[in-house]
């Protein structure tokens, strides 16, 4: 049987929790994009700021990188005999949540996650959606396994579990949802 989110009710509660958060962030992102006229989605609000299409491309790039790292960590853990999930899930640390929500202090994306500007908004959205599908398929395939013990290193935030990495993806998406909302306000004021 499937839940309202389309997930199996037999899915481990830890995975349901993080997937539900990811779905909520995705819905908010979609609403923010839809609130901006399609003709404005490739327009930069200022020369040194990203367009909506570029923000979406960035999100797809980051998710692709994170999904690859999660895939490697799960594969390594499985090869070492990853057991069934019995542990508690530690949520993403409050300090990381706070940092991700901070839109006052600008951050510079690493080179590998900087948008090329070659995708229009529709193609960038499709890339984001495709990335989410790959992430969900990958992690769903490990449903019930001890993902709370599978650790990955983040270059800035340090060691995190698979669940925390998924929450980080949602928090990162939330940060950029706010950015898209800001872009929309700026562009609406310049029309």
Q: Language-model segments: which ranges?
A:
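Hydrophobic-ligand binding "helix-grip"
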Residues: 121, 125-130
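A structural motif
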Residues: 98-110
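Acidic/His metal-coordination segments adjacent to aromatic residues that form catalytic metal sites
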Residues: 110-122, 155-163
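Short, contiguous alpha-helical
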Residues: 42-99, 129, 133-191
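An N-terminal domain-cap segment
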Residues: 13-49
């Amino acid at each position: 049987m499937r839940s309202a989110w389309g997930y199996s009710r037999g899915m481990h509660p830890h995975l349901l929790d993080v997937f539900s958060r990811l779905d909520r962030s995705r819905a908010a992102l979609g609403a923010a994009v839809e609130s901006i006229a399609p003709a404005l989605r490739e327009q930069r609000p200022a020369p040194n700021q990203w367009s909506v299409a570029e923000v979406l491309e960035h999100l797809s790039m980051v998710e692709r990188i994170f999904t690859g790292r999660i895939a490697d960590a799960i594969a390594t853990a499985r090869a070492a005999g990853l057991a069934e999930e019995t542990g508690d899930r530690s949520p993403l640390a409050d300090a990381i949540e706070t940092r991700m929500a901070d839109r006052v202090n600008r951050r510079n994306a690493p080179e590998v996650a900087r948008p090329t500007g070659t995708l229009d908004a529709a193609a960038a959205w499709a890339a984001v959606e495709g990335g989410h599908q790959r992430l969900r398929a990958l992690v769903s395939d490990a449903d019930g396994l001890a993902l709370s013990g599978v650790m990955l290193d983040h270059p800035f935030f340090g060691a995190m579990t698979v669940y925390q990495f998924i929450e980080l993806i949602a928090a990162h998406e939330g940060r950029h949802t706010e950015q898209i909302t800001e872009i929309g306000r700026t562009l609406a004021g310049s029309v």
